[in-house]
From Swiss-Prot:
It comes from Pseudomonas aeruginosa (strain ATCC 15692 / DSM 22644 / CIP 104116 / JCM 14847 / LMG 12228 / 1C / PRS 101 / PAO1). One of its GO terms (molecular function) is protein dimerization activity. This is USG-1 protein homolog. Coiled coil: none annotated. InterPro entries: NAD(P)-bd_dom_sf, Semialdehyde_DH_NAD-bd, Semialdhyde_DH_dimer_dom.
Length: 336
């Protein structure tokens, strides 16, 4: 690897930021000095890293010329306010918020489209895709080498941690209220989420699509291009604290060789294929792991040209934080 860099993590006190900081430590990320940053409300807190305790600084006053790489794991408005400022100061940026258009900050995954970096110039301004897009594309990228996909349908069951710590707190609060037979007044969500499924995640636009559905659509298209054909995305809010669960159907041009599909999955690094007669779950398999789990590989009930997949992953650690760290490692090794 290249010489260690000074690195900043913006949004270090959030759930994804905290996981990202932990992975930098676990993976011995090649950094010289780590700066933890957050909004003024969180500045002054202390967080552990390696053998030390680091003070969280205020992103509004931070001089990005003092670091070579910054991970933006904060809210979208923070990235809109500071990502371009960081790049103008000579700092390469990996944004996890989805705030920046793909034409401005192209989504990049090491296992999917790392070659995209060759057409970019330092200092880089890149997006690390949202957890669902990352989990889906990691599984599809190797399969598309053998499958001629004409259409892709995705239904994603999102945990409340997709909304950060506040989502986790709200599900815990609602669950406690209901179990204690107390009246429930929803706060973060527009209706009860505990012991319930919500048919949409957040507000929808004039066509009925939510912001996260639009983001997944744009990022998957940017990562996989025309290899998947038309894409349809539905996101459901599930009463689960952590982890994503995806039901995926690929419509292919020819009957699908299921044995070939499972061979590819079994041979791909970062993917754990759970064989026939079993299936993976978020709680039982994926939480805290660095792999994406795939099961229930089967043909369509009335169409041998369809293949169905069940995908589960830790959305905070694997889907968001690890993909960004892997991208940072690649940048330092070859480009910075």
């Amino acid at each position: 690897m290249s010489q260690p860099l000074n690195v900043a993590v913006v949004g270090a006190t959030g759930s994804v930021g905290e996981a990202l900081v932990g992975l930098l430590d676990e993976r011995d990320f090649p950094l010289h000095r780590l700066h933890l940053l957050a909004s003024a409300e969180s500045a002054g807190q202390r967080m552990g890293f390696a053998e030390s305790s680091l003070r969280v600084g205020d992103v509004d006053s931070f001089d990005f010329s003092s670091v070579g790489l910054a991970f933006f794991a904060a809210a979208a408005e923070v990235s809109r306010a500071h990502a371009e400022r960081a790049r103008a100061a000579g700092c390469s940026v990996i944004d996890l918020s989805g705030a920046l258009e793909p034409s401005v900050a192209p989504p990049v995954m090491v296992s999917v489209n790392a070659e995209r970096l060759a057409s970019q110039a330092a200092p880089f301004l890149l997006s690390s895709p949202c957890a669902v897009a990352a989990e889906l594309c990691e599984v599809l990228a190797p399969l598309l080498a053998t499958l001629d996909c004409r259409q892709l349908n995705l239904t994603a069951c999102l945990s409340v941690s997709s909304l950060g710590r506040e989502g986790v707190k709200e599900l815990a609060r609602q669950t406690a209220e209901l179990l204690n037979a107390r009246p429930l007044e929803p706060r973060l969500f527009d209706r009860q989420i505990a012991f319930n499924l919500l048919a949409q995640v957040g507000a929808v636009d004039a066509e009925g699509h939510s912001a996260i559905e639009r983001r997944i659509f744009a990022e998957v298209q940017a990562l996989l291009g025309e290899r998947i054909g038309p894409l349809n995305v539905t996101c459901i809010q599930a009463p689960v604290f952590f982890g994503d669960s995806l039901s995926v159907t690929l419509q292919c041009a020819e009957p699908v060789d299921l044995a070939a599909v499972t061979r590819v999955l079994d041979a791909t690094k970062g993917i754990e294929w759970v064989g026939e007669g079993d299936y993976p779950t978020v709680v039982g398999d994926a939480l805290g792991q660095d792999e994406t789990y795939v099961g229930r590989v089967r043909a369509g009930q009335a169409d041998p040209c369809q293949v169905n997949l069940w995908i589960v992953s830790d959305n905070v650690r694997k889907g968001a934080a690890l993909n960004a760290v892997l991208l940072g490692e690649l940048l330092i090794k070859h480009y910075l």
